[in-house]
């Protein structure tokens, strides 16, 4: 039998104690708090952090009465930043707040001062967004991304439940998968490399770190069928990672947009998600095209699919919609495009209603760590597959 042609593809993730992800979570915690009291809140909240300091800044127009400083401290504390030696002390760090109202120019262009009906609300900005889906995992997400993300989530789990008490909040993961291309569809064959770098306390040895990570993090996450004697493990390869969180590196909202989406697969229009209300198409547009791409694959129209949508500020209708199934479509892409346009409303006001995106609570903070897509949680409304009617070609 001829040797199968394979290739390697790598995705990375960071867990909730990474300084950039800390900032994403604070931005979304503030969005949640605003939406909970005032579903029409307009929020563009950025966060940055460095040693002993968190700053939030941006534009928020809301009727909600929100204690920004309390939300910042509560979010840091929940992640595990409770003392200087782990990288940040939630109760004693400096919290700076510089929040203004949304520009009236933007407000009148997008919302017409709230006189517009939902279908008339214009996009909050220009831009283009991509949604992607692939049949290689039950989540219809890329395996390299799913494994990197789940390793990061598991790292946090064993820290918080006390299984590995030496763990500290900051950590990064990376997974290389060997794939073969099956007529445009991606088929994972094995895991080639697993890399974990996690913050740890002073007491633990590198051998203990490696043993614990293999037993309590990798084993429960990576399915046995993908591991073999040739799989490479890099476990804390730098040798020492005691200083971490905002003390180790500065953090900023919107710096982890590939981790938030598809791990380098598909494509990305460049817009970040966290801290943005649903009139910002960077977020709502990306959510609706994920639902479209996922529905195409789940309905058997294709094994792999990418959907692009684009917008102009103040204009409700998208400027373009694009579909590519990488040659895996059961019917031509132009017919799939027609089905997508008939079944999905890409106008921002309608996306907000159809995906129920004005609901706050603890909804968006959940998206701000471990990925916005492929999650099994009723709050992730864009993961709900829409049934699509299509005529299967005669055999």
From Swiss-Prot:
Substrates-to-products reaction catalysed: L-methionine + ATP + H2O = S-adenosyl-L-methionine + phosphate + diphosphate
SUPFAM superfamilies, per the entry: S-adenosylmethionine synthetase (SSF55973)
Pathway named in the protein's UniProt entry: Amino-acid biosynthesis; S-adenosyl-L-methionine biosynthesis; S-adenosyl-L-methionine from L-methionine: step 1/1
Coiled-coil segments on the chain, per record: none
Residues that, per the record, bind L-methionine: 59, 102, 249, 280
Cofactor: Mn(2+); Mg(2+); Co(2+); K(+)
Enzyme Commission designation: 2.5.1.6
A biological process term (GO) from this entry: one-carbon metabolic process
GO MF entry, a single one: metal ion binding
Secretion signal span: none
Keywords noted in UniProt: ATP-binding, Cobalt, Cytoplasm, Magnesium, Metal-binding, Nucleotide-binding, One-carbon metabolism, Potassium, Transferase
Binding-site residues for K(+), renumbered to this chain: 46
Note on cofactor: Binds 2 divalent ions per subunit. The metal ions interact primarily with the substrate. Can utilize magnesium, manganese or cobalt (in vitro).
Pfam families associated with the record: S-AdoMet_synt_C, S-AdoMet_synt_M, S-AdoMet_synt_N
Its biological purpose: Catalyzes the formation of S-adenosylmethionine from methionine and ATP. The reaction comprises two steps that are both catalyzed by the same enzyme: formation of S-adenosylmethionine (AdoMet) and triphosphate, and subsequent hydrolysis of the triphosphate.
Protein family membership: Belongs to the AdoMet synthase family.
Name listed for the protein in its UniProt record: S-adenosylmethionine synthase
């Amino acid at each position: 039998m001829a040797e199968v042609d394979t290739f390697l593809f790598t995705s990375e993730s960071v867990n909730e104690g990474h300084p950039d992800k800390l900032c994403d979570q604070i931005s979304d915690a503030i969005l949640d708090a605003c939406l909970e009291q005032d579903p029409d809140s307009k929020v563009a909240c950025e966060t940055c952090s460095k040693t002993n300091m968190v700053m939030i800044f941006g534009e928020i127009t809301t009727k909600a009465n929100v204690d920004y400083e309390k939300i910042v401290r509560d979010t840091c504390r929940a992640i595990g930043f409770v003392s200087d030696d782990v990288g940040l002390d939630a109760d004693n760090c400096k919290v700076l707040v510089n929040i203004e109202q949304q520009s009236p120019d933007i407000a009148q262009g997008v919302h017409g001062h709230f006189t517009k009906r939902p279908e008339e609300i214009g996009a909050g900005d220009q831009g283009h967004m991509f949604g992607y889906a692939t049949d290689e995992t039950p989540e219809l997400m890329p395996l390299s991304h799913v494994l990197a993300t789940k390793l990061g989530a598991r790292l946090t789990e064993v820290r918080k439940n006390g299984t590995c008490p030496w763990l500290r909040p900051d950590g990064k993961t990376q997974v290389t998968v060997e794939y073969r291309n099956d007529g445009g569809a991606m088929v994972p064959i094995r895991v080639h490399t697993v890399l974990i770098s996690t913050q740890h306390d002073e007491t633990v040895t590198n051998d203990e770190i490696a043993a614990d990570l293999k037993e309590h993090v990798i084993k429960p996450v990576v399915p046995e069928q993908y591991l073999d004697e040739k799989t490479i493990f890099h476990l804390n390869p730098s040798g020492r990672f005691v200083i971490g969180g905002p003390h180790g590196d500065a953090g900023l909202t919107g710096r982890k947009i590939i981790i938030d989406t598809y791990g380098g697969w598909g494509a990305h229009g460049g817009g970040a998600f966290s801290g943005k209300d649903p009139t910002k198409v960077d977020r709502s547009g990306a959510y609706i095209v994920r639902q479209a791409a996922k529905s195409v694959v789940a309905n058997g129209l294709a094994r792999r699919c990418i959907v692009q949508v684009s917008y102009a500020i103040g204009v409700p209708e998208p400027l373009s919609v694009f579909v590519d199934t990488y040659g895996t479509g059961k019917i031509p892409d132009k017919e799939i495009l027609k089905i997508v346009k008939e079944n999905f409303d890409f106008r921002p006001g309608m996306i907000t209603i159809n995906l129920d995106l004005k609901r706050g609570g603890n909804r968006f903070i959940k998206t701000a760590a471990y990925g916005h897509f492929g999650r099994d949680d009723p709050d992730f409304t864009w993961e709900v597959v829409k049934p699509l009617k299509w005529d299967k070609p005669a055999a």
